[in-house]
Amino acid sequence: MKSAISKFGCAAFVIGAVALGVSTDANAQRKFTFGYDQPRSTAYGIAADIFDAKLKEVSGGKLSIDQFPGAQLGQEPVMLQKLRTGDIDFVITSTANASTVAPQAGVFSLHFIFRDQDHLAKTLADPQVSQAFREMIKESVQGAQVLGLITMGMRNMYAKKDIKSVEDVKGQKVRVQATKTEDTHFPAYGAQTVHMPFGEVYTSLQTGVVNVAENGVNVYLANKHYEVAPVLSMTEHEANNNCIWVSDKTWNSFSDEEKKWVQAAAEEVSRTEPMKALALEKESAERLKKLGVKVVEGVDKAGFIKAAQPIQDQLAKELGPHAEKILGLVRNIK
């Protein structure tokens, strides 16, 4: 009787384990939480899809992710905190938000350091740039590390009126990411900076708390900011760069082989996501035009650049040696 009960108990455990998706052998699948604060239809979703597909490929299906888009796990600063405590496995954040825990990450928020979109894509795929950024994060942040770099394209300004030159932002209240670089660049253009979580931007534009916001074209489209700020001016003042993070708790749970799989997936994202994200930006601009949004092209950038360029080296030096090194690497990429 005792033997029969034991056998029944073992069988029940196995059935329960299968029903719950619990591993009963070393080759079972493992799924990890992957959070980001933008809709699935943005470049964040593109990056997560590439990461998941490559991870499944190299691991033979043993490792994969569950995506939590649209700030389901919190806005980026909140997710970063949860990541560092091991409550989330993977997160995508902007490099600007990364600078809240690693100030030298603000180097990627410097204005007009990328000559064009091709230069941007080459930079993010460059192993030296990626390694320099990862070393900087490793030295500055406890509880998490960066696996790779991605982009959402270039940031542009949007408002209820045209921004055709630097004169048009003078005296305006501009919602910016809370970084030293933004708080230095925009006042140099004559604007007043305002900090707030991304989720508050729509209402703040609607009520006039801010007059201007800035972000990628697809982000502007996906979050329907055009409803309250129907003029998109293509200032392309800053790259909308981002990074893929992993919790140290999760990373340390991987075998050496699994770490290689995860890093390979991140490298695939850095190599292929930028061009897809840039293509998405162009598609989004066309969709916005059809929705009646006024897209101001041919912005006179000369005044912006004249104010921004002297600040680049000054800010990089103030941020620290890692920032100076990364800026030098960016400038040297042909």
PLM-predicted stretches and their roles:
Residues 1-12:
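Bacterial N-terminal signal peptides that target proteins for export
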Residues 20-28:
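Sec/Tat signal peptide C-region and signal peptidase I cleavage site
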Residues 13-20:
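Residue-level signal for alpha-helical transmembrane segments in multi-pass membrane proteins
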Residues 2, 25-26, 98:
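Coiled-coil-like amphipathic alpha-helices with heptad-repeat character
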Residues 29-120, 128, 135-334:
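N-terminal secretory/targeting leader peptides
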